[in-house]
Amino acid sequence: MGGFKEVFRQDSKYMAFFISMVTFALAFGLYKGVLDNYLAQVVGMSEFDKGVSEFFRELPGFLLIFFLAVVYTFSAEKIYKLGAVIMVCGMVMQSVVPPVRFLVILAMFIYSLGEHIQLGMRNTLTLEYAKEGRGGIALGMQNSVHQMGMLAGYVIIFAVCFFAGKTTALFKPVFIVSSLILLLGLIFSFRMTGSSETDKAKRRFYFRRKFSKYYMLEVFYGARKQIFFTFGPYVLVLFYGADAMIISLLFAISAVCCFAASPLVGRMIDRFGYKIIMIMDTVILVGVCFLYGFAHHIFPRDVAFVVCCVNYVLDSVISLASMASNVYVKDLSDSSEETRATISTGVSVNHLISILIALFGGWIWHTL
């Protein structure tokens, strides 16, 4: 913990914050590791149903800015705890409701609402607890801890499925365990007794003509994120028959690769500039999408499955290039407040496109 002591203020509640965050990430890893298979194999969701479920799962991300405007008098710690309470409610509901589409989607929406509320506060609290001039490394440590928590969840799901075999009876117990872990994280979060101010820039939309290209980039990133995050794993489950063990292993490999590649991508942005990185990202993405969509026409089925898995991981890695757009905004901004406000608006634009793509993508898959 020596590294943490060098980065964070000793009078802050950074330890309770990080312990709660890693437990929330662990619970998410367990939950996400089985969710796609649960929806396909137990709930019986079709491709279009999956799009509908993702519409409601992403909707809280778009609504977040309105929620923060309502609770603007709350401290960042209080909003973070509120998000944890909502996450617990959503996961408990997922644990007890029967596999009925409406109830399952409602539980997903509630959990996602809490998740997005916390997502909006994590950076604020990290920067608040960091020592002067240590904000960058503090954010990096926060991201690493969160990735490790999710990775642990994926590895646990892989191990359980490996030893228990291919059985759908594991899904509900996983949701129950995730609920208990979330409850533990909630308990730790109650030890965060500070009164950090929320970022005022996150309470309003901020549109300026000079950032029009950035908003268009967020439209692009929101669409590509939703296509791969939502329908990428579902292709592997429905078309190639991947079970929860394979999906959780894929998520784990993806998390490890992103964890390792994130600093490298950051250095490449600094060295070559954001324009070169964004162009490289787009060129590589064209090949990734082509192979993901047409691999089964080019290769034997087993080989095509491996190609799709590799492309899923590759897309996760190259999506890190979206950091370049933040550097682009910083270069154009006249102040740090304008940077934060623009990026926050970009996040809302990103989620708006995500929820529309979820429905449109599901309709296309179902129709074709």
Spans of model-derived segments:
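Cytoplasmic helix-loop-helix junction between adjacent transmembrane helices
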Residues: 109-145
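Glycine-rich segments within core transmembrane alpha-helices of 12-TM secondary carriers
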Residues: 140-158, 347-357
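Short amphipathic helix-loop junctions that connect adjacent transmembrane helices
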Residues: 33-49, 230-247, 329-331, 366
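Intracellular juxtamembrane helix-capping segments at the cytosolic ends
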Residues: 117-130, 319-334
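Hydrophobic core of transmembrane alpha-helices in multi-pass small-molecule transporters
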Residues: 22, 90, 102-118, 302-320
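Helix-to-loop junctions at the C-terminal end of transmembrane segments
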Residues: 63-76, 161, 261-274, 362-366
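C-terminal ends and interior cores of transmembrane alpha-helices
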Residues: 85-99, 283-301
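C-terminal membrane-cytosol helix-exit motif in multi-pass small-molecule transporters
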Residues: 157, 161, 179-198
